[in-house]
Structures are given as C-alpha cells and as structure tokens.
C-alpha cells in the first residue's frame, strides 16, 4: 500500500482536529499513558542476537480479499515514508504534542489503529550522558530477554533468557485444586443420559463404572473420536422439573460437538428434589466417582451447570482431581444463584465453598447482577447479559412460550431444537408463575445459541460494584467454546475476577446477538444512542467513549441515530463471531468491525455503515473438534490488529547511538503492541504484542529491546544512526514518538578506544 501523508491519512477528521486545537489553546493538559520515559546510557556488553522466525500466521491465505485479521503483521499500519537522509526531520514540531484520530483505509485491509483508557500521566524525558553500564537482571516471573555482559564489539548483540522470549510465567495463576473425601459424598447413585444418534433415542444409566464400560462397548463413547467429556447438569428441582429442556440441550450439543462425549447428569436422588436449603448443601456431595474411575485419564473434562448444577460441576471436578490427579478444563455456571430467589437467606452458604478453584477456567453466565458483588469469588469471568426487555416479551404467554433454536457450527454442522413451556413440568400441588419458569430457562438457551459460529457474545469490561481503578470498556468475545481468559490483557496472568457486560435479543425463532456501537466524542457533549439495549460511557482524557448494545435482530449492521448536538469524532460498530475459513483452520473468536460515516441532521447524527469491514482476533483458548487450541505462541508473538484509536504524537527525541530509552507506564494500563519503524530502510517491525517479544531477524543489528512485563517497563537501544518512530498501542490510543539517533562524542570516543 502506498504511503500517505498525515493530512491525507486523516482526511475527513477536520472537526476532530479543530476540537483538539481548541483544547490545546485553552491550556487543557493532554494526559499521557506513560508515567516516565527516560534516556540513559546503554551498557555496551550486549550479546547473542534474537533470531526471529516467521510470523504466527502459517495458514493465512494470500488470496486478495481473504483477509480476516490474521494476515501478515502490521503490513498496512503506519506505512513508512520514503527513506530519509540523516539530516531529514519528520513533520512534527519539537516543542508540541499532537493528537488526532486514526482513520479507515480504503483497501481490503482496512485498519483503524487502537489504544486505552482512564487517567494517566504525561510522558517525561530526562537525558543522560552517563556512559556507565546500568545493571540489568533477568526477572524471575515473566522474562523475555536478559542482557549478557560480553564485549559489545564482538559477536551478536542479543541474548535470549533461559525461559525463552515468549514464555509467560504466571505468578499467582496456579489454582490449589481442592479434593473431596469419600465420606463426604452421597451414597445414592446419580443417573446419566446420552443421546444415541443411530437409535434416535436417549440412553439412561446409573453413574457407575459398569455403565461407562457399557457406553464404550455400544460406541456411545468412542475412544478414538471423543477427546472431551462434557457434563450437563440441571439445577434445583424442588418446584420445577426441567429435564426435557436439558435433554434437548444434550441432543443439540451432541450434534454440534461430535468429538465430545455429552452426558446429562441427573442428581434428583442425591438432593435436587429436596428443599432449597438441603439442595444447596447436597449439590457439593453428588457422587459419580465410580463412573469417573473407569474413564481414560487423558480425557479432558468440561461441565456446564444451571443454578445449583454449577456446584455439582465443582464436586465432579474435585472427584476427578482426587481420582486422576487431573484438573477440569472448564466449568460454565448459568445463573448459579438462581435458587436464592426462593431462599435469599442462603446466600452465605453458597459462598462458603467456591467453584473457582475446581477448574482451570470458570465462567458464570448470568442474566441478572443480583447477588453478584465484589465479594464473589466463584469465577474467573462473569458474563452479565441484559435480558429484561426481550426475555420478558418471549415469556409474555407463560404457558405457550416457544423458541426454535438453529445453529451452524464447524464443518457446516447444522442442528435445530425446539424449547418451550411443553418441556417443563411442576411438582404436584405446586403452583408457580409460568413466566418465572420461562425466564429461568431462557439463559440456558441463550448459552446454546453461542454454538453458532456467528453468535458469539460481544463483551465490554465493566467494573464490579464498589471497585476502583478498573479498566472498563475493554472489548472481548465469549461463547460456549471458550476455556480461557482473553490472552491480550494483563489480567490473563492474574487471579482477579473479570466482569463483562453483554446483551441479547430473544424471539420465537431464537436469539440474536446484538452489535456494539462505539462513538468517540468530546467530553462536554451529551449523547444518546437510539434503539440501544444498554449504553454506557467513560471519560478518557479529553475524549469520551460511548458504547451501546444495539437491539437489531438481523445479521446486518443498521443505520444508527445519535441524539446529540455534537460534534462527534469517530464511530464504528462491532460484533463477535468465530473464524471459519478453509485457509486458516484455527477456530478463534474474532471482533468483526464495521466503520460508520455520520452526518449531522438537525439535533441528531445519522450514522450509516460504510461496508468497510475488517476483523481482529480475540486470542482466547478454544476447545473444538477434538482439540484445545492454545493461544500463546510457540516461537513468535501473536498478531494484533487494532481497531479505532486516538493518536498522540510526541516531539522528536534526539539521542545518541547506544543511549538507552527506558519507558515505564502505569500498571493499570494495557499495552497491546509496540512497533519500530525504520525510516532509513522503509520498514516497520513489531517488537512485541501483548506479553510476548516478537522475533524478527531483520532488526538484529539495529535495535536492542528488553521488556519487563510485570514491572511494566522496557529498555530500547538503537544501534545505528538514523530516523525511527516508536509506536505504543493501547486499546483506545496510540503513542507515537519519533527518535533521531546520531553518533555523539562519547560514543565515538568509546568506539575509537575499542578499536585500538
């Protein structure tokens, strides 16, 4: 792609620049991400250059127009200009900071750069001519590169740390899995059911070792095909029996996940039909140890539980750990506190024994935030889905509600199931509001909707109640295939619970997952998005970011009306999907992004989609088709494709060769990527993405780079004179800093001495 001037690249954003100019004139401080960037002398004892292999996208198609956000890294992001002379300068003043908004490109690789949020401090520079080596020690937690202390004039100039350049060491993420003692478990036998596709019926059996051998000999369990066992567990049956809802769910899961063994677990005989108080206690004592003991040890265990079934999942995983010393891959709890609507005084009892330690990844899918608070520690991620309007409309006729759910998965697998009031029965003599039953069942169906490759839930990070210093509005994607947190964010390696909001639109033909509409605007204006399920905003420096879940029910991006006098700076919409391509077999979540063009009409803005669609990968661990697809790279960093951003341009930094730039930034900021543009060779190289240092042989002799992820700091040393640009990418902004490197007297002296 040909390079563009700054003016050309940002055409159409004159309003944005005007607003920013006014802010600058009035002396508004442009608060920056970095708490400190300083320049010091670099120790001249580097050794052993990093050797960078090819990028992660080995399977990317090179066919024009087939780009899905997985293409060659940074091929069209800030394309370098012509090769400058050493005396040339960039078109950036040396005493002023510039801000603008990134703009879309018109090629098939449309890229709108990206950045982050919340208050932060200005970049500060301090210059030093001290040539004494600084002390650099390898970190013990997350280490990318460590500096050796050999003669810098001989051999290579890099040394990879013993842990490798791309290893993420999780300081506190290892979970102490709890074991159950045999005497604590129920002596009653639970029952299980599986769908037999050949027979066209369900097979029900006791949860014993003999039963596992039976399903093996009858090929319900296939040793060759089945790599995962996926338990589905119902909740409290003291008032309502929803067995048929779950059997329909099991049939759908069996058809959509052919490489997984899907098993429905009924625990009525072990306490599910008792009182709510008893059921809460007995859910942790459900016993299937005999069945688990007969299973091959290499199987991966997953469990999805509704209401108290979430805690039964925890019991299953503890038994599995006690028997096999294995750890469940994931637990998905659907409205686990639902029973509290009948017995709110039992809240404390449910939190005595958390399920969060029972699997590698625990997610809670909830349609209400009631009973969820910062004291909750039951999940790695909470997915709070707004359902108030649409689910109530589905349940308007409480005894005739009906949903026909159809999903399309990998390999064009398609299946449909009908869920409705006819699938639910109530206990004799018990009268319950049918609409309440309907509202309890819909979250199960909402989770099953995400089996469809185009129906992943768009997520926006929210702060838990009473929490402070949370990074909100960070986007992500979630669906039933997810078995790991979002790798892109620093919270991947922390034990903090993450909270996300999402939304859903329900109808008698199934569910539709809404798109998210995002607007960048000055902080002084009032703005409301029409036809939104929910909306929120956050003030980010001198920009306000508005986000709203649109309640459109089609697969198409709608025209959006903004109630505001403006001005607005930028707008786009995005939704979640799973990548599905013959060219790139990894089934990873993606954020599909549509650029919008907005026109001011009277007291509103009308925003129309531009048909410029691109996608960026959301790196989460996924299980599908018999495989767990890891997200962390084996020998290189992962591609990062940014969305929209505020661009902050810093003055040119003048330094000498071998001077060290140390950049540190606030811990609550999320660095997504760092690129290094070499104007001398017209190349742009990615130095890191997320937690991983990239490997690129072309820059072996040009730059030294060291990244301390835990300490949120880095050292950068340029080894050859010339003109360069460093770009730090955050979820909502980009920091650009031109660097002019030249020989100085101290370096020339050292060079002469070394040569002698």
From Swiss-Prot:
Keywords: Glycoprotein, Secreted, Signal. One of its GO terms (cellular component) is extracellular region. Its main location: secreted. It is found in: Secreted. It comes from the Viruses. Residues 1-30 form the signal peptide. It comes from Gallid herpesvirus 2 (strain Chicken/Md5/ATCC VR-987) (GaHV-2). May play a role in host immune modulation since the protein is secreted and provides an advantage for growth in vivo while it is completely dispensable in cell culture. The recombinant protein experimentally lacks lipase activity. Additionally, it possesses an uncharged asparagine instead of an aspartic acid residue at the catalytic-triad acid position found in conventional cellular lipases. Glycans are attached at residues 222, 241, 287, 423, 495, 542, 552, 580, 660, 684, 715, 744. The keyword Secreted applies. InterPro entries: AB_hydrolase_fold. Residues 100-113 have a biased composition (Polar residues). Residues 96-120 are annotated as: Disordered. This is Virulence factor MDV010.
